[in-house]
Amino acid sequence: MTWLGALDSPHRSWRRIAAAVGPGLVVMLADTEVGSVISASQSGARWGYRLLALQFLLVPILYATQELALRLGVTTGQGLGELIRARLGRGWALLATSTLVVSCIGALLTQMSGLAGVGQIFGVPSWITIGLIVTAIFVMVCTGSYHAVERVALVLGCAELAFLVVAWRSHPDVGHMLAQVVQQPLTDHDYLYLLAANLGTCVMPWTVFYQQSAVIDKKLTLPDLKLARLDTLVGAIACQTITAAVVMAAASTLGGHAGGASLDSVPQIADAFSKALSPSTGRIVFALGLAGGALVATIVVCLTVAWTLGEVTGFHHSLEHHPLEAPWFYACLLYTSPSPRD
């Protein structure tokens, strides 16, 4: 049965579809986080549309990686940390988890810097922005089920569609775009650096660990696999389409030629994108898109660390458990949450 067949089957109710959809979309929306937006903005500002095609070429790679995590979770009923421990031993599991934690710390610092930058656009001190966000996320996770947290993440992720609006209003020159897409200066070190940066922000360790653990917390089984794969594919396409929109907007508004503008901070990028709209509207739309991706990524990263540490150490871990039933899980979640000092 094909994916479309699975959707059309009389045995597939809307409730079943809703039950299977979610982990793939959430993790892909988290993948369009602050680091991805900055890399895409710099790519468009400096090299125009030359790195645009790469964004769509990465869809199969992104899907294949996340689909493997999905399949492992559904078929084994184990998270990646738990699976590594069972198959390869405690030492390899601890090594993988240590690497993951380092990656997650870096990701959290990136998201917090981006969210602090969004606050600065509107004159809000960084410590207030980060403090409010961390408190809200922790309260949400402690008081909500997996399904509730997932729905909130999906709603926040929808804010990333703002980048599509910016790209559309930047009025890209199609002829110029097609001419630059085929120009690939592969001998230029700066170009290769940005190409590598785009590759690096496409697939990250915490996205793989998250999806495998999320399908378990959501209790997906083999009958859900086809729809869950479709969920992941749609998410991968959405993720790279949003990233491509950022590249297009930066290329259209900043000229996109070698030696072009250098975008090193969130306010700088917001000012550049405001050229596609009015200054005030442009900043609001950009802030909305960036904050949406950063918030989803923050939720995903914190849950990934808590889930994986629980898997490796053998403690129960689920958003379906009350904090008193799973103190280790929520303690890990609190510990990994960034503080306003960050």
Question: Which role does the model predict for each range below?
Answer:
Residues 1-35, 91, 194, 220-226, ...:
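Membrane-interface "cap" regions at the ends of multi-pass membrane proteins
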Residues 335-342:
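Conserved small/polar residues in nucleotide/adenosyl-binding loops
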Residues 10-14, 48, 75-102, 121-126, ...:
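Transmembrane-helix boundary/entry motifs in multi-pass membrane transporters
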Residues 157-183, 192-212:
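Hydrophobic alpha-helical segments and their helix-loop junctions in multi-pass secondary transporters
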Residues 71, 75, 93-124, 130-134, ...:
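Hydrophobic transmembrane alpha-helices that form the core helical bundles
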Residues 27, 54-87, 95-106:
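Juxtamembrane transmembrane-helix boundary signature
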Residues 34, 38-40, 209-238, 257-268:
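Hydrophobic, small-residue-rich membrane helices and short re-entrant helix-turn-helix hairpins
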Residues 63-75, 237-268:
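Extracellular/periplasmic helix-exit of transmembrane alpha-helices
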